[in-house]
């Protein structure tokens, strides 16, 4: 599927990862810290409903601010932890070059913090170093951080994006498809990415392709529907663009023999396409659609 599916772990089928008998416990966020452990943000309130959702006669006994000074952060450490000392972060005093090197850190917190600080500083003297990091790093996560640092410093170009579109890591290709939307020179590579072996990459490439106004994308959108049209998500991805919800797309499908074999999902597509064209309410498109009905 082109989307994430959350599932309980095998050891958590009959228990919660984190629970409390305290009815004020309101876990609101989860993150990885600089030490690699999990940190849970507990907003800790007696009530989380707003007064607007509570009948007026019940509000008289309710203090909606109760607990607003009692929020806390929990640090969750595995029982197997050996208590190994960890490096206390001080990235605010790091040189820009050191921040670039930190994009290769094994811990997500260090990498994302280094990326944020690089973008805040906007020291463009390190752009060559970041480009080299993207080209030479063996870690796809580091290559991805480098890409977005370049994007945030307005140093991204079509050559780099084309390389990212062909990256061996699916996650890098998926993000490269988003970045390719700004570069017409990447259109051909982006079109080919709609046939990627990774459904998530193919899905994002389909969405990104719709940002272009070039009618040459229509045959590729039609091919995507032929391959993945059974999925409502792929149909929505195609229909989300102007050209992907046009009579020209309908003509391309007809020409390819799309309607030769009747299938329920194809009926759904025709209905969704007609509804989208109708909602857009462009007279020329409506006229052309009715002529083909």
Model-derived regions, located:
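Long, ordered, helix-rich scaffold segments
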Residues: 63-68, 77-293
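Beta-propeller domains with acidic blade repeats across secreted/periplasmic ectodomains
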Residues: 1-98, 109, 113, 117-120
């Amino acid at each position: 599927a082109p989307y994430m599916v959350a599932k309980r772990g095998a050891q958590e089928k009959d228990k919660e990862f984190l629970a409390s008998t305290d009815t004020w416990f309101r876990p609101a966020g989860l993150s990885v810290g600089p030490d690699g452990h999990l940190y849970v943000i507990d907003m800790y309130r007696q009530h989380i409903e707003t007064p607007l959702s509570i009948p007026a006669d019940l509000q008289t006994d309710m203090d909606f601010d109760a607990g607003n000074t009692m929020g806390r952060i929990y640090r969750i450490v595995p029982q197997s932890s050996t208590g190994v000392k960890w490096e206390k972060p001080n990235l605010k005093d790091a040189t820009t070059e050191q921040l670039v090197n930190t994009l290769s850190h094994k811990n997500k917190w260090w990498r994302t913090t280094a990326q944020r600080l690089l973008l805040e500083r906007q020291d463009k003297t390190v752009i060559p170093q970041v480009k080299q990091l993207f080209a030479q790093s063996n870690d796809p996560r580091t290559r991805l951080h480098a890409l977005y640092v370049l994007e945030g410093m307005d140093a991204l170009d079509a050559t780099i994006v084309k390389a990212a579109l062909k990256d061996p890591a699916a996650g890098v290709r998926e993000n490269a498809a988003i970045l390719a939307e700004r570069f017409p020179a990447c259109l051909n590579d982006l079109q080919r990415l709609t046939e990627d072996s990774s459904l998530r990459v193919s899905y994002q490439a389909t969405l990104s392709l719709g940002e272009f106004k070039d009618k040459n994308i229509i045959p590729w959108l039609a091919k995507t529907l032929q391959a993945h049209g059974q999925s409502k998500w792929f149909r929505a991805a195609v229909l989300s663009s102007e050209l992907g919800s046009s009579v020209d797309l309908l003509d391309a499908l007809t020409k390819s023999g799309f309607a030769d074999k009747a299938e329920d999902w194809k009926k759904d597509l025709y209905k969704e396409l007609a509804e989208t064209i109708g909602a857009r309410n462009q007279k020329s498109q409506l006229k052309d659609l009715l002529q083909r009905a």
